[in-house]
Amino acid sequence: MSRSVWKGPFVDAYVLKKAAAVRESGRNEVIKIWSRRSTILPQFVGLTFGVYNGQKHIPVNVTEDMIGQKFGEYSPTRTYYGHAADKKAKRK
């Protein structure tokens, strides 16, 4: 179920503070965040966020297409190695 419209998008306060500080300084640096649940807002377009996936920070360059989605969607947490191959079939 999606979030109610009257509540507005959820963004952790520290993400807003860090984004405002980088915008104000004019530097193009990676903003490290741990909040995968925060929604991407229009004011984040053009910034680079390092979204934590449990092991490391994955750099995410925010574009206009990403507005309204969550940061966690762009930082996968699981590694897919493929299905195990059948060893008997490989030998033939």
UniProtKB/Swiss-Prot annotation:
One Pfam family linked to the record: Ribosomal_S19
Alphabetical UniProt keywords: Ribonucleoprotein, Ribosomal protein, RNA-binding, rRNA-binding
A GO cellular component annotation in the UniProt record: small ribosomal subunit
InterPro entries membership: Ribosomal_uS19, Ribosomal_uS19_bac-type, Ribosomal_uS19_CS, Ribosomal_uS19_SF
GO molecular function annotations of the record: rRNA binding; structural constituent of ribosome
S-S bridge residues: none
Domain of life (superkingdom): Bacteria
GO BP, sorted A to Z: ribosomal small subunit assembly; translation
PANTHER family found in the cross-reference section: RIBOSOMAL PROTEIN S19P FAMILY MEMBER, SMALL RIBOSOMAL SUBUNIT PROTEIN US19M
Function: Protein S19 forms a complex with S13 that binds strongly to the 16S ribosomal RNA.
Family per similarity comment: Belongs to the universal ribosomal protein uS19 family.
NCBIfam families xrefs: rpsS_bact
Protein name per its UniProtKB record: Small ribosomal subunit protein uS19
Originating species: Ruegeria pomeroyi (strain ATCC 700808 / DSM 15171 / DSS-3)
Gene name in the database record: rpsS
